[in-house]
């Protein structure tokens, strides 16, 4: 066997696993049953996010070239990223808002989060999520800066997921998050490094630092809420974390875009 072949195969396998779990891209990998495979592959989540961001940026660029306004181009870019991911993270955000906002007991909150129907809290959360991201992209306007912002947001938002999974215990023993297991330290470190690198290259050191601080604070608040109300994290909580990350990074990019 050629030296390094097994390592390359593992990297490719992890990339396919990550992409298959957070996108609808035809990567040729079904959800794996091997123990520890999902947790190990979490390092590749920011890489999968980078691909999603690039797809949204491409649509924004094409829309701008066709003469569409920044508002319409931003809307199409968001629609593209939602289609590629199957609105997986948006669904998690809505379920989290409904569960944490609507249930009185831990059991009822978890029951609501598993319900496929969407409630008032979920609708409001989705409106705010799409509205804030749409407004941020439209404010940035410049196609090149939008590309950098989308890549940074989708990459960094997923880069924190392994750490969140590692630090916050599963809320129930039978959920997807519990079955995946806690990511090993190596996966957490690689994901963080990839996310930080992309964020820094895309937005610059200053804005990247602001984004990391705000994203960490948002993650701590969400973790505290999840532990207090339902005893830990679920797949829906992870989706809400990703959406929060996108919003934070895009708002940072929009707020400081004039300073580039």
UniProtKB/Swiss-Prot annotation:
Q: Where are the transmembrane segments?
A: 42-62, 68-88, 118-137, 144-166, 180-200, 201-221, 237-257
Please give the InterPro entries that the UniProt record associates with this protein.
CobS
Tell me the pathway. Cofactor biosynthesis; adenosylcobalamin biosynthesis; adenosylcobalamin from cob(II)yrinate a,c-diamide: step 7/7
Keyword match Secreted: no
Any one GO cellular component localisation term in the record: plasma membrane
**In which broad location class does this protein mainly occur, judging by the first location in its UniProt entry?**
membrane
Q: What membrane topology is annotated for this entry? A: Multi-pass membrane protein
Entry annotated with the keyword Oxidoreductase: no
Protein location: Cell inner membrane
Q: Name one Pfam family in it.
A: CobS
Q: Which cofactor does it need?
A: Mg(2+)
Q: Which domain of life is it from?
A: Bacteria
- Group of enzyme by EC: transferase
Q: Name one GO molecular function term.
A: cobalamin 5'-phosphate synthase activity
NCBIfam families, sorted:
cobS (TIGR00317)
Its job: Joins adenosylcobinamide-GDP and alpha-ribazole to generate adenosylcobalamin (Ado-cobalamin). Also synthesizes adenosylcobalamin 5'-phosphate from adenosylcobinamide-GDP and alpha-ribazole 5'-phosphate.
The entry's family comment says: Belongs to the CobS family.
State the name under which the record lists this protein: Adenosylcobinamide-GDP ribazoletransferase
């Amino acid at each position: 066997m050629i030296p390094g072949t097994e390592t390359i195969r593992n990297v490719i396998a992890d990339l396919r696993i990550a992409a298959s779990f957070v996108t609808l891209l035809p990567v040729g990998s079904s959800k794996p049953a091997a123990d520890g495979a999902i947790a190990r592959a979490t390092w590749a989540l920011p890489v999968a996010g980078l691909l999603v961001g690039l797809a949204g940026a491409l649509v924004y660029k094409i829309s701008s070239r066709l003469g569409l306004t920044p508002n319409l181009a931003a809307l199409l870019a968001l629609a593209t990223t939602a289609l590629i991911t199957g609105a997986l993270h948006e669904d998690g955000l809505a379920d989290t808002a409904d569960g944490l906002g609507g249930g009185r007991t831990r059991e009822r909150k978890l029951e609501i989060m598993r319900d496929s129907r969407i409630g008032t809290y979920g609708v409001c959360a989705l409106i705010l999520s799409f509205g804030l991201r749409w407004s941020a992209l439209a404010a940035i306007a410049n196609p090149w800066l939008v590309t950098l912002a989308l890549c940074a947001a989708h990459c960094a938002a997923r880069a924190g997921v392994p750490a969140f999974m590692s630090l916050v215990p599963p809320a129930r023993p039978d959920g997807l998050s519990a079955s995946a297991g806690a990511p090993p330290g190596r996966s957490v470190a690689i994901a963080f490094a990839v996310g930080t690198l992309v964020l820094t290259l895309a937005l610059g050191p200053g804005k990247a630092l602001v984004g990391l601080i705000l994203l960490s604070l948002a993650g701590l608040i969400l973790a505290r809420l999840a532990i207090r109300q339902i005893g830990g994290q679920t797949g829906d909580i992870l989706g809400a974390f990703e959406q929060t990350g996108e919003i934070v990074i895009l708002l940072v990019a929009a707020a400081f875009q004039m300073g580039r």
